[in-house]
């Protein structure tokens, strides 16, 4: 589920994915590699990474770039990842049947991923 519900200025585009079915610790391992990089470099890195977390993050980067291009008219070549964060979500609780009518709890972690893209030229003018 991808949501965006922020008041944005003309220089940044955001995308948020909630309840991604993986641990926040494992997703942070991928997010730390792309923070601060350009959009094209991020796409190349994520497509070659062997981790399971890279696919939902890649989809989210594409979504944030589409928001920047279509809604704000920014150029794809000037975008960079200004903010990328992973927060822990709720645990999906399930029961695993065991012998003699018993059951064990399974807690499956989820996480929320936020990507913010900024324009290099416009962010330099504002500072």
Swiss-Prot record:
Pfam family, one: Ribosomal_L22
GO biological process annotation, one example: translation
Keyword line: Chloroplast, Plastid, Ribonucleoprotein, Ribosomal protein, RNA-binding, rRNA-binding
InterPro entries for this protein: Ribosomal_uL22 (IPR001063), Ribosomal_uL22_bac/chlpt-type (IPR005727), Ribosomal_uL22_bac/org-type (IPR047867), Ribosomal_uL22_CS (IPR018260), Ribosomal_uL22_sf (IPR036394)
Cell compartment(s), UniProt: Plastid, Chloroplast
GO cellular component: chloroplast; large ribosomal subunit
PROSITE patterns: RIBOSOMAL_L22
GO molecular function, a single term: rRNA binding
Family: Belongs to the universal ribosomal protein uL22 family.
Assembly: Part of the 50S ribosomal subunit.
Protein purpose: This protein binds specifically to 23S rRNA. The globular domain of the protein is located near the polypeptide exit tunnel on the outside of the subunit, while an extended beta-hairpin is found that lines the wall of the exit tunnel in the center of the 70S ribosome.
Protein name as annotated: Large ribosomal subunit protein uL22c
Gene transcribed to yield this protein: rpl22
């Amino acid at each position: 589920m991808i949501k965006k519900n922020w008041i944005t200025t003309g220089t940044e585009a955001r995308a948020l994915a909630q309840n991604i079915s993986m641990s926040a610790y494992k997703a942070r391992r991928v997010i730390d590699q792309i923070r601060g990089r350009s959009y094209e470099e991020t796409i190349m890195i994520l497509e070659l990474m062997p981790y399971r977390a890279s696919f939902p993050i890649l989809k989210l980067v594409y979504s944030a770039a589409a928001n920047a291009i279509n809604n704000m008219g920014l150029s794809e070549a000037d975008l960079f990842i200004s903010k990328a964060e992973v927060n822990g979500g709720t645990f999906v609780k399930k029961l695993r049947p065991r012998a003699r009518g018993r059951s064990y709890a399974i807690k499956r972690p989820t996480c929320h991923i936020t990507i913010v893209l900024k324009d290099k030229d416009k962010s330099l003018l504002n500072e």
